[in-house]
């Protein structure tokens, strides 16, 4: 820590890292820890010149006062009586932390795994809370020590990881009130930024625990391509290696030798996947080390000083530097055949030969650092190993049960992980095991996958559990295909958010309360979240109601004007507290909203596996307010020294001026080698009426209008990327009239209710319009059954609620 931020005594040390972040240390031996730890790698991320604080004595207590915190301490071993910090601006009781207090109001973080989960599980703490404070205890983590000089280092390729001395406490107090985003950004400052992901990681992943042959796998990829279903990542589960081994060796879960019965020419197989536009990861379970039946055994045994003739197993030991070197040499050989990155499937607990060292953390740390060698783009795929794990993306959440309960938990789980800075979870989309077949459930899970950090389809080896869309009936099949195509189309948008995350510490997915911390309603929609800067996503996690033929999701829209991303319908949230309602959707879509002024870039040629910067782009515009989006692209090459600020990048700013009804696509700024010299642009305005259009000041008739989505599409054509392009409406861009009658008729038409009741409902709507709801609530239809009894039927609650959404949206 910078000496300027430190107040120190014989056995205690306090560091004022920011005006809201305090480090608290107690040491029985009077020595303090300055090395990087497994979690914390930078305690000097903010200039002390910008930190305002006063330090003084008052009634025998040490007092530290900043604009946000008031700390008092008796200079004794930490106790609830002797150490407290008040967060200014928060409730006097709940906003004051006493040492050892329970974090009962913590907004939570994430968990190591969802293995075996069938619904909600407990989560660890995050760095934000309702009460305005959170505590990160780093006392037990190991420290990183460079071999050559003993100095702390997190950048050395393989720094030594050493246990801490006993009798020391090391706490970080986050007192940010409800400045949640700032708290997480400073957590990144303390623990390191989230790395930039390679572009291919944001596309669709195909994964299945299944004994494919090479020919079967390649044929499947060809079938996807023929169906126009894009994938960018091919996951090969554990059957790539030999799994049927002699019982004397133990289980077949660990392996490093290709199963040549399934993959007779591994290098050719991986080359073919690359040729088809797919990057590849192989699954490994490292626990059992390297045994005598493995091809790499002899060389590794000699390296480790074991006589290969003995057949003695090479024990897995990440605390042994010799083993680690030999272990990675073995992986490098496989990478030389074409493996792009590794799926580290560690499920065997948290104990190594070194006190306090979790093997999962060590594997993640070493694999990620190793993956960056020789200018490669670093990437690994593994489970969460505690705070700071965001430095080693991507996260594998584990094997979940196929159930509505599992689906229902995942949006909340994903968004809440942002509270501990963990933004790149990859779930088993569709669920992995057990459960029951439910085609609607699978479709909804695919839709969640589109608006998830990573979209990786996965399933078990059961012949009945394949996730290929053609295994499902219509309309589920089409919903699945549409979802996968949309995910690929969203890549320019998501990749820009990927850059935002790496540079600004702004995650792709943020809970609603990050942006609206003082709105109580924002805490009441746990499955709703911001998906990047422009969109709010609300996955449907309940089964369809049979009466309305729709499924619902609880929605809260903050004050302002919003548009349905798919249909262009406009929602006016006029009051300061926002608008609460249930959104009802058929199987084909889920609720996604864009605020007025929203701009979303899509790649038009989305039915390919390409991850190149596209030559054709579509810009979705949601009018009603000014908007701006800066599209970030790079040349696909990672910075050799890991400094992404030195990468070749290009920014294309797209802006919409609502007053003049003009969209401007600015000339690309930055490295001209990044973007195509010419690019074909299409601009689609959602929620508008048909209007006359000019392109660069000239009237254009190359437009089309889609009544279903209230969308005006302008085909701009192929333009040089070093010149501005404008799309304007000389007579103004008029918002579309709200098709209330059409939408309510569609609800009534789909409803599985008596025809006379449909007709009565339609008549009430024709007569009363948007004021028809009281009449609809009192409607009923009586009929006689075959025994002469009277049967009374009213509009079902689901039909009424679906109609209510339409009537109240504007």
Where are these regions (language model features)?
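Aromatic- and carboxylate-enriched substrate-binding clefts and catalytic-loop regions
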Residues: 96, 230-480, 515-521, 525, ...
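Charged/polar low-complexity intrinsically disordered segments, enriched in acidic residues
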Residues: 736-790
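Catalytic and substrate-binding clefts that recognize carbohydrates or anionic sugar/phosphate headgroups
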Residues: 52-199, 208-209, 214-215, 221-226, ...
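Solvent-exposed beta-strand/loop surfaces of large extracellular or lumenal domains
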Residues: 36-51, 306, 563-587, 692-716
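Short, well-ordered beta-strand segments enriched in hydrophobic/aromatic residues
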Residues: 14, 22-26, 63-71, 536-539, ...
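A conserved hydrophobic secondary-structure block that centers on an alpha-helix together
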Residues: 116-117, 194-197, 201, 207-264
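Catalytic core of carbohydrate-active enzymes
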Residues: 368, 387-395, 409-413, 417-427, ...
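A low-complexity, Ser/Thr/Gly/Pro-enriched, surface-exposed linker/loop concept
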Residues: 17-59
């Amino acid at each position: 820590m910078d000496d300027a931020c430190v107040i120190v005594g014989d056995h205690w040390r306090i560091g004022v890292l920011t005006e809201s972040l305090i480090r608290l240390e107690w040491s029985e031996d009077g020595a303090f820890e300055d090395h990087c730890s497994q979690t914390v790698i930078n305690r000097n991320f903010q200039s002390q010149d910008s930190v305002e604080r006063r330090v003084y004595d008052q009634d025998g207590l040490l007092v530290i006062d900043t604009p946000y915190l008031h700390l008092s301490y008796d200079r004794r071993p930490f106790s609830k009586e002797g150490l407290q910090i008040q967060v200014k601006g928060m409730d006097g009781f709940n906003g004051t932390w006493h040492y050892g207090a329970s974090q009962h109001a913590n907004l939570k973080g994430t968990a190591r795994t969802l293995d075996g989960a069938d619904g909600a599980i407990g989560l660890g703490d995050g760095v934000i809370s309702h009460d305005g404070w959170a505590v990160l205890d780093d006392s037990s983590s190991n420290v990183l020590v460079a071999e050559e000089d003993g100095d702390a280092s997190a950048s050395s390729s393989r720094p030594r990881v050493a246990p801490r001395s006993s009798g020391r406490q090391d706490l970080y107090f986050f007192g940010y009130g409800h400045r949640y985003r700032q708290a997480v950004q400073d957590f990144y400052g303390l623990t390191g930024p989230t790395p930039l992901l390679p572009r291919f990681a944001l596309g669709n992943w195909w994964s299945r625990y299944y004994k494919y042959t090479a020919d079967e796998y390649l044929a499947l990829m060809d079938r996807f391509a023929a169906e126009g279903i894009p994938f960018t990542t091919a996951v090969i589960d554990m059957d790539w290696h030999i799994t049927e081994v002699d019982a004397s060796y133990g289980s077949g879960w660990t392996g490093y030798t290709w199963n040549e019965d399934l993959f007779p020419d591994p290098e050719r197989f991986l080359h073919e996947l690359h040729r088809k536009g797919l990057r590849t990861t192989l699954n490994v379970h490292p626990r059992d080390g390297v045994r005598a039946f493995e091809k790499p055994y002899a060389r590794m045994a000699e390296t480790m000083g074991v006589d290969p003739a003995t057949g003695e197993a090479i024990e897995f030991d990440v605390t042994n530097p010799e083993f680690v070197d030999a272990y990675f040499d073995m992986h490098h050989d496989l990478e030389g055949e074409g493996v792009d990155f590794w799926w580290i499937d560690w499920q065997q607990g948290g104990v190594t030969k070194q006190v306090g060292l979790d093997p999962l953390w060590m594997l993640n740390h070493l694999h990620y650092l190793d993956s960056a060698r020789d200018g490669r783009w670093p990437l690994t795929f593994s489970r969460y190993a505690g705070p700071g794990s965001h430095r080693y993306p991507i996260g594998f959440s584990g094997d979940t049960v196929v159930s509505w309960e599992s689906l229902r938990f995942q949006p909340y789980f994903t968004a809440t992980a942002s509270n501990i800075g963990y933004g790149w979870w990859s779930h088993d989309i569709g669920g992995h095991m057990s459960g029951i077949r439910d085609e609607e459930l699978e479709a909804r899970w695919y839709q969640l996958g589109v608006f998830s950090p990573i979209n990786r389809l996965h399933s078990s080896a059961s012949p009945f559990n394949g996730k290929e869309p053609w295994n499902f009936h219509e309309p589920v099949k089409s919903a699945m295909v549409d979802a996968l195509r949309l995910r690929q189309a969203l890549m320019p948008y998501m990749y820009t958010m990927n850059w935002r995350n790496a540079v600004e510490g702004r995650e792709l997915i943020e809970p609603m309360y990050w942006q609206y911390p003082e709105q109580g309603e924002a805490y009441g929609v746990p499955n709703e979240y911001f998906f990047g800067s422009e969109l709010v996503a609300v996955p449907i996690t309940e089964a369809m109601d049979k009466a309305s033929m729709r499924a619902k999701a609880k929605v809260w829209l903050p004050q302002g004007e919003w548009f349905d991303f798919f249909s262009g319908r406009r929602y006016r949230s006029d009051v300061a507290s926002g608008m609460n309602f249930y959104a009802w959707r058929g199987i084909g879509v889920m609720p996604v909203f864009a605020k007025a002024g929203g701009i979303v870039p899509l790649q038009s040629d989305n039915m390919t596996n390409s991850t190149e910067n596209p030559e054709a782009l579509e810009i979705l515009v949601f009018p009603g307010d000014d908007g701006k989006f800066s599209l970030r692209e790079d040349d696909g090459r990672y910075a050799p020294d890991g400094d992404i600020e030195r990468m070749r990048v290009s920014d294309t700013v797209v802006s919409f001026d609502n007053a003049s009804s003009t969209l401007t696509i600015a000339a690309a700024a930055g490295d001209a080698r990044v973007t195509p010299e010419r690019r074909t642009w299409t601009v689609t305005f959602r929620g508008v009426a048909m209007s006359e259009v000019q392109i660069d000041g000239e009237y254009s008739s190359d437009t089309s209008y889609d009544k279903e989505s209230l969308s005006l599409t302008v085909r701009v054509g192929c333009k040089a990327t070093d010149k501005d392009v404008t799309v304007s409406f000389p007579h103004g861009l008029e918002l579309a009239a709200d098709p209330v009658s059409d939408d309510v008729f569609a609800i009534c038409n789909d409803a599985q209710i008596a025809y006379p009741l449909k007709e009565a409902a339609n008549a009430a709507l024709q007569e009363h319009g948007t004021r028809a709801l009281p009449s609809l609530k009192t409607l009923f239809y009586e009929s006689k059954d075959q025994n002469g009894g009277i049967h009374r039927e009213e509009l079902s609650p689901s039909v009424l609620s679906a109609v209510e959404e339409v009537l109240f949206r504007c």
